[in-house]
Amino acid sequence: QTCALPISVNNQDITKIKDKDFADFRRENLGFIFQDFNLLDTLTIEENISLSLVINKRNPADIEKRVHAIADKLGIRDILSKFPYEVSGGQKQRCACARALINEPKLILADEPTGALDSKASRLLLETMADINKKMQATILMVTHDPFSASFCERILFLKDGKIFNEIFRGEKSRKDFLLISDIVS
């Protein structure tokens, strides 16, 4: 269903982008973190992460540098030469996250990004996403049932039966204070 209002991403109204140009826009401006990874089994972890940069014809040295930097941040550097079927679910999720973040997108759409991760990997991913939000002014739209994950967000919408029933702006509240508030509100 189309929206009557303009939807702006990176100062561009996406409702006016022609179908033939939308794939390029999406590849350059959006990052997707899926609950079920969506990795290509015939590519290594490194190739999965770098795919959008390769398609955009980035410099190979720049690609390698960026892949290694994001892999280091997410603790997956040691599995870059492996294939998705050779690694754990948590490692696949971190690979999927690296792939979404590699292009430094202006909008990241994340569906339960920490669902398959242990607490350490979850914290690493959420801190990386918060860092990207601050440094690159990227907007992150995250679906989660986890108050810990939501505590990294500045604005939280609570949905019930498809409708917003509450909203919290964290503002200057600490993540710990937010966790207490979110327990009461939800």
Specify the residue positions occupied by each region the protein language model found:
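Conserved beta-strand-loop-alpha-helix hinge in the C-terminal portion
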Residues: 163-186
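ABC family nucleotide-binding domain
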Residues: 4-152, 159
